[in-house]
């Protein structure tokens, strides 16, 4: 019983330490400024104009939408 108590105690302490540590694991793309627009996040069928606009609004921009930055690259979410 003593070994089990110690094992459970160490497990719970480890869980507490891991859960209380700050985790900044969210990856973000480098923002590029193109013609006065802040462009980031590649647009897809899931990440469309609406979600791009919502992200721009939550970042403090008045609006945003998906733009083709160059013909050889995919559309990017650009805030303006």
Curated annotation (Swiss-Prot):
Q: Which Pfam families match?
A: Defensin
Q: Tell where it localizes.
A: Secreted
A GO term (biological process) for this protein? defense response to fungus
Q: Name one GO cellular component term.
A: extracellular region
InterPro entries, sorted: Defensin-like_dom (IPR056373)
> Which cysteines form disulfides?
39-79, 43-66, 52-77, 56-78
Q: Which domain of life is it from?
A: Eukaryota
Keywords, ordered alphabetically: Antimicrobial, Disulfide bond, Fungicide, Plant defense, Secreted, Signal
Keyword Plastid (UniProt): no
Q: Which residues belong to the signal peptide in this entry?
A: 1-27
Q: Name the family the entry cites.
A: Belongs to the DEFL family.
Protein name as annotated = Defensin-like protein 51
Q: Which organism is it from?
A: Arabidopsis thaliana (Mouse-ear cress)
Give the encoding gene's name: LCR48
